[in-house]
């Protein structure tokens, strides 16, 4: 068993892209934990729109000035990564009951592999319950208005990626 500090939390995800829901959860997590490592997953069964470097950069820019955080890529098993980083907690967000079953299974598997690493769930702020990176990308790909659902830098990158001009002041 490795040495871990329960005051350091890992918040993992693909963040393809980071949404205001993610940012809100990280801000709230900063009120609970001394430090949060925003761990951007490199190994994902999904086909990301943005490269790992783009996702890390967008998250770093969007979260600048938000508490004590580090944004970095990770590969491999999450619990192994958490242990290497000295984190005693994996932070996860829940939007709906449908999220819970999957997240509960992951938490149990992680606990089986590394009993000393806990999973803590935070409910998503009600303003962001309906958004996900997948829904954001679907709307943006069709020119939908996603302003206010993602950080400004992410908004610009999505508009550029899909070839739509973005309003500078709207």
UniProtKB/Swiss-Prot annotation:
Q: What is its main location?
A: cytoplasm
Q: Which Enzyme Commission number(s) are listed?
A: 2.7.7.3
Q: Which GO terms describe its biological process?
A: coenzyme A biosynthetic process
Keywords of the record, alphabetical order, are: ATP-binding, Coenzyme A biosynthesis, Cytoplasm, Magnesium, Nucleotide-binding, Nucleotidyltransferase, Transferase
Reaction equations catalysed = (R)-4'-phosphopantetheine + ATP + H(+) = 3'-dephospho-CoA + diphosphate
Record bears the keyword Magnesium? yes
Which Gene Ontology CC terms are recorded? Answer: cytoplasm
- GO MF assignments: ATP binding; pantetheine-phosphate adenylyltransferase activity
| Cofactors demanded by this protein | Mg(2+)
Name where it's found: Cytoplasm
What job does the chain carry out? Reversibly transfers an adenylyl group from ATP to 4'-phosphopantetheine, yielding dephospho-CoA (dPCoA) and pyrophosphate.
Please give the subunit comment from the record: Homohexamer.
Q: Which family does it belong to?
A: Belongs to the bacterial CoaD family.
Name listed for the protein in its UniProt record: Phosphopantetheine adenylyltransferase
Originating organism: Oleidesulfovibrio alaskensis (strain ATCC BAA-1058 / DSM 17464 / G20) (Desulfovibrio alaskensis)
Q: Which gene encodes it?
A: coaD
